[in-house]
Amino acid sequence: MSQIGGATCTWRYLGRFVTLGIYASVALFVWYTLVPTRSKHKDSIAINNNNADPATALIPVHTKNVVIYAATKFFGHPITTERFLATCPDVQNYCRITQEESEFDNADAVLFHNADYRGSTDKFKKMKSQRKPGVPYVLWSLESPTNDMFRPDSHMINWTMTYRTDSDVWAPYGTIVKLKNPVEVDLNAIWEGKTKTATWLASNCITQNHRFDLIKKIIDNGFEIDIWGNCGKQVSQCAGVDNQESPCVLELIKPYKFYISMENSNCKDYVTEKFWKALNDRMTIPIVLARKYYKDLGVPDSAYIAVDDYATLDEFLAHVKKVNKEKDLFLSYHQWRKEWKVIIGSGFSGWCTLCNKLQDKDYILKNPKSYKDVAWWHSFEMCNNQIASKYL
């Protein structure tokens, strides 16, 4: 029976696995440029060629020791080398992160986590006035524009490090690659392991894209969804676990055929771990709001179900109910596993990529770049939060 209640099972940002990116350069002197589009991302190409983790896909020859000054905390928590470069231990041999203000003058890059940036403080005023050529200022963001309105000064930011494919340092929550050779997949075992219909784990119940309203309407129309976390029942067997990387959470979700992978906002390239993990070892069929955002990231159409493929909610419900009952139809959504592989973003691997990009100081100086208005780049115009409204 579908369950909606009020309990807690939150997973904070520090537990999240995500790769994240950076901004850099100089306000009055030099503005640098890195690869602006996904098609040109060397780290993206390396992933596609080698089926590698984004954290280690591009490891250049070590030419210099790098120091990154973290000018902010990460949701109030310290930013340390040990935690944020954990996915690339080899990089730690020549790159380190510091939050000591005494090292600001010697840093190779200065990084700001958008949610912790407070531009009016004396500390940040000093950073604006004492910039050095060849030292990029990097904006790091995990969140969509709907939940994250960073407002730095014009031309302050040189590089962006986000999930967006047009970031200067691309830090995706996950990606998918075509295998060189098909592999065998026991599809019958997937079907036999599915004893429940659909589930959703969530901590954010009130969102501008009305996803919870749509989920409740889907339930009201006879499609069973078990809801866990802040928006539903407490995950009793996972007491004390507050992040989605826990094996306990994997075991909770694995018996379900479908996972509700609707994001808290519908924005360009904003596809988080909830989708990639559902697709990967949890062996579920993700249900998403809009196909465009996943198609743009190269996910095979047959790997998920998008609500906006259907003219009405009744048409959508008729299809998912049929998939739920018919084995062959259900397994058609798992055929992709024979030819594709999901790569989960390793959390903070954007830092690893940043360390590597900072190796080439000559390139930085010869390719100046800055954002006149990074707030526009990361704006509401990149989002469409009205998709669910059509079905309410």
Curated annotation (Swiss-Prot):
> How many cofactors are bound and how?
Unlike other alpha-(1,3)-fucosyltransferases, appears not to require a divalent metal cation as cofactor.
Q: What happens when the gene is disrupted?
A: No visible phenotype. Loss of several tetra-fucosylated N-glycans. Loss of tetra- and tri-fucosylated N-glycans in a fut-8 or fut-1 mutant background. fut-1, fut-6 and fut-8 triple mutants lack all N-glycan core fucose with only one fucose present in the bisecting galactose, thus resulting in the loss of tetra-, tri- and bi-fucosylated N-glycans.
Q: What GO terms fall under cellular component here? A: Golgi cisterna membrane
Instruction: Give the temperature dependence.
Output: Optimum temperature is 23 degrees Celsius. Very low activity at 37 degrees Celsius.
Q: Provide this UniProt record's keywords sorted from A to Z.
A: Glycoprotein, Glycosyltransferase, Golgi apparatus, Membrane, Signal-anchor, Transferase, Transmembrane, Transmembrane helix
- Glycans attached where? 158
Instruction: Spell out which residues lie on the membrane's Cytoplasmic side.
Output: 1-12
Among InterPro entries, the record links this protein to: Glyco_tran_10_C, Glyco_tran_10_N, Glyco_trans_10, GT10-like_C_sf
GO molecular-function annotation terms? Answer: alpha-(1->3)-fucosyltransferase activity; fucosyltransferase activity
User: According to its UniProt record, in which pathway does this protein act?
Assistant: Protein modification; protein glycosylation
Q: How is its activity regulated?
A: Inhibited by divalent metal cations.
For the keyword Transferase, the answer is yes
TM helices/strands, residue ranges: 13-35
Q: How does it sit in the membrane?
A: Single-pass type II membrane protein
Q: Which cell locations does it reside in? A: Golgi apparatus, Golgi stack membrane
Tell me any Pfam family this protein matches.
Answer: Glyco_transf_10
The residues exposed to the Lumenal compartment are 36-392
Q: Which domain of life is it from?
A: Eukaryota
**What is the annotated role of this protein in its UniProt record?**
Involved in the fucosylation of N-glycans. Preferentially catalyzes the addition of fucose in alpha 1-3 linkage to the distal GlcNAc residue in N-glycans. Catalyzes the transfer of fucose to Gal-beta-1-4-GlcNAc-alpha-pNP (LN-pNP) and Gal-beta-1-4-GlcNAc-beta-1-3-Gal-beta-1-4-Glc (LNnT).
* Membership in a protein family: Belongs to the glycosyltransferase 10 family.
Q: What's this protein's name? A: Alpha-(1,3)-fucosyltransferase fut-6
The scientific name of the source species is Caenorhabditis elegans
Classification lineage:
Eukaryota, Metazoa, Ecdysozoa, Nematoda, Chromadorea
Q: Name the gene for this chain.
A: fut-6
